[in-house]
Amino acid sequence: MQLNDLKPAKGARHQKLRVGRGIGSGKGKTAGRGHKGQHSRAGGYHKVGFEGGQMPLQRRVPKFGFTSRKELISAEVRLGELNKISGDVVDLASLKAANIISRQIKRVKIFAAGKLEKPVTIRGLRVTKGVKAAVEAAGGKIE
C-alpha cells in the first residue's frame, strides 16, 4: 500500500444531496420543504422560543429565586492555597496581597482541599470543621 492508494472505506463518505433537480431525483419541485408556509420560503424563520403566537414556555412558567448580592463579595479558598502566603497570619489582607482573592472580596470561607504544610494563624475568616482540624494538627490556630 502506498500513500497515493489511500481512500476512505466504502460507505464512509456520502455525496451531498442536490435538491430541486427534477422529479427523478426524489427531491425535485419543492426540494423537501413541503408546500407553502414560512418554512418553504427563503429567508423567513422564527426566533428561538417562538411558539407561533402561543405564550412561550419561558413566559408560562413562574419566576423563582434571586441572585444574592453577597455572591459578588464572597469567595471560597482552598486550604492548600494558604501555603502561598509568605507570613504566618492569614487574614483578608494577606489573601489579597498573595493574589488568592480579588480586591472586591469582603467575605471568605476556607474549605479543606489540599494540604497545609506550615503552621498558620487564621484571623477573621470562616472555616469548615475539616480546616479547623487540619490547622490545629499543623500547629496553627484560628482566632
Swiss-Prot record:
Composition bias type Basic residues, residue spans: 30-39
Keyword annotations: Ribonucleoprotein, Ribosomal protein, RNA-binding, rRNA-binding
GO cellular component, one term: cytosolic large ribosomal subunit
Annotated InterPro entries: Ribosomal_uL15, Ribosomal_uL15/eL18, Ribosomal_uL15/eL18_sf, Ribosomal_uL15_bac-type
Pfam family, one: Ribosomal_L27A
GO biological process: translation
GO molecular function: rRNA binding; structural constituent of ribosome
Region Disordered, annotated ranges: 20-52
General function of this protein: Binds to the 23S rRNA.
NCBIfam families: rplO_bact (TIGR01071)
Subunit structure of this chain's protein: Part of the 50S ribosomal subunit.
Family from the record: Belongs to the universal ribosomal protein uL15 family.
Stored PANTHER family: 50S RIBOSOMAL PROTEIN L15, LARGE RIBOSOMAL SUBUNIT PROTEIN UL15M
Protein name as catalogued: Large ribosomal subunit protein uL15
Organism: Coxiella burnetii (strain RSA 493 / Nine Mile phase I)
Gene, per the UniProt record: rplO
